[in-house]
Amino acid sequence: MATFDDVKDVIVDKLGVDEGKVTPEARFVEDLGADSLETVELIMGLEDKFGVTIPDEAAETIRTVQAAVDYIDNNQ
C-alpha cells in the first residue's frame, strides 16, 4: 500500500516544492506549480517508486496528491 509520505517524497523530489505545501488536497498544477513536463516526470517517478503503470488516461485524472495516493493504493 502506498503511503502519503512515500508519495510526498516523490513530489518533493520531482517538483522541488517545500514538503509543507504537499497536502492531500494540494493540486499539482494550481497549488504546487507543476508544468506539463513536471507532471509527466512526477507520474513516471510514481510509477518507478511503486512499480505500477499509470496509463495516460488515468494520469490525466490524477490532479491532487490524494488522487495519486488513491490510484496507487488501488492498483498496486
UniProtKB/Swiss-Prot annotation:
Single GO MF annotation: acyl binding
GO cellular component, one term: cytosol
Gene3D superfamilies: ACP-like
Modification type O-(pantetheine 4'-phosphoryl)serine: residues: S36
SUPFAM superfamilies per UniProt: ACP-like
Disulphides: none
Alphabetical keyword list: Cytoplasm, Fatty acid biosynthesis, Fatty acid metabolism, Lipid biosynthesis, Lipid metabolism, Phosphopantetheine, Phosphoprotein
Protein's pathway: Lipid metabolism; fatty acid biosynthesis
Pfam family, one: PP-binding
Domain Carrier: 1-76
Compartment annotation: Cytoplasm
Posttranslational modification: 4'-phosphopantetheine is transferred from CoA to a specific serine of apo-ACP by AcpS. This modification is essential for activity because fatty acids are bound in thioester linkage to the sulfhydryl of the prosthetic group.
Presence of keyword Nucleus: no
Gene Ontology biological process terms from the UniProt entry: lipid A biosynthetic process
Biological role stated in the UniProt entry: Carrier of the growing fatty acid chain in fatty acid biosynthesis.
Protein family (similarity comment): Belongs to the acyl carrier protein (ACP) family.
Annotated protein name in UniProt: Acyl carrier protein
UniProt organism field: Deinococcus radiodurans (strain ATCC 13939 / DSM 20539 / JCM 16871 / CCUG 27074 / LMG 4051 / NBRC 15346 / NCIMB 9279 / VKM B-1422 / R1)
